[in-house]
């Protein structure tokens, strides 16, 4: 019953899609357990880039099952477009399975997302305006529409009318905005449901049957621990639980069936949108890292904020997600820097040092990073295939990251390609 969870340990964009794609070669089922099409991951296969937002990375292996679990909020229109995009590039989605319990994102969710964000003025949290938060709000309020409802014309019509009445009152009275007409949504989205019907099933049964049969199952998270609604930099977070614990809720698989948790991180840190970022760089070094690392959001296209590796963040991620292994990506981006830094602790204005990540944003704003400086390296390391092939300074950097986080490094990457991911220890035991 081997199962592996892949989680982002920073603020997303750590290269989870790349690592999931890499680990998928030894998995038989690959499942997504939370988030929506606000997440974006880029996978490079034979030099060709594929950008996905909803469909699990395992879709590139036609003999494997790819699952969108019940914890995902699904935009049917986006999903159909993604299936078409894959088909145009010679990739079939026949192995895709969608949970009938997953909640559906509808146009009123996206509109509400936009209006709520605009109303915050300079206190915006940096949402992607994909309707993710409002869809999860409806889910928690027990008024959401699930995929199973979308497939039943009578139920969909009844629930859509009820929800639209409530949402339109909110649009008109609270935001002085135009209402959405029932006819604008109903037929179009019912038809989307019919197009997706062949993929819809009880995915919890598929996942548990696979695990009980001894098959290898890989769970793929979106975003990262620091964007988790409970464990992240609240309120600058997403509306779901990217932490490993989110797997059990978002896939219908019990916690006793999770074998290993692989935390994915970059050799530096990045973040899209607003919110705390203790090691953020505003100088030429930051600009160099952004440009060399192509740090622009897959979903939004926005330039990402970048900074030094933060071991305080990483130890927090280790604790709340129970990391057993680490995948360290983008080491090559740091090539050419004379000195590289790692944050080892924070210092408060009163001189006190702390090694944990504060919950209070006010307390966090009072903290400055304490850095350990290491020699950089100038060599091109993109063709290195073993730890021994790395320059001594790069090897020392990799080892120091593992020591400070306190987790074994199972893979390190020196570029975006599959062949540039190097294994130090197999998480599958093969």
UniProtKB/Swiss-Prot annotation:
IMP binds at residues 13-16, 38-41, 128, 142, 223, 238, 302. Gene3D superfamilies: Adenylosuccinate Synthetase, subunit A, domain 1, Adenylosuccinate Synthetase, subunit A, domain 2, Adenylosuccinate Synthetase, subunit A, domain 3. It catalyses: IMP + L-aspartate + GTP = N(6)-(1,2-dicarboxyethyl)-AMP + GDP + phosphate + 2 H(+). Pathway: Purine metabolism; AMP biosynthesis via de novo pathway; AMP from IMP: step 1/2. Its main location: cytoplasm. InterPro entries: Adenylosuccin_syn_GTP-bd, Adenylosuccin_syn_Lys_AS, Adenylosuccinate_synth_dom1, Adenylosuccinate_synth_dom2, Adenylosuccinate_synth_dom3, Adenylosuccinate_synthetase, P-loop_NTPase. The active site is at 13 (proton acceptor), 41 (proton donor). Substrate binds at residues 298-304. GO terms for biological process: 'de novo' AMP biosynthetic process; IMP metabolic process. GO terms for molecular function: adenylosuccinate synthase activity; GTP binding; magnesium ion binding. Binds 1 Mg(2+) ion per subunit. Its EC number is 6.3.4.4. The keyword Ribosomal protein does not apply. SUPFAM superfamilies: P-loop containing nucleoside triphosphate hydrolases. GO terms for cellular component: cytoplasm. SMART domains: Adenylsucc_synt. This is Adenylosuccinate synthetase. It comes from Lactococcus lactis subsp. lactis (strain IL1403) (Streptococcus lactis). The lineage of its organism: Bacteria, Bacillati, Bacillota, Bacilli, Lactobacillales. The gene is purA.
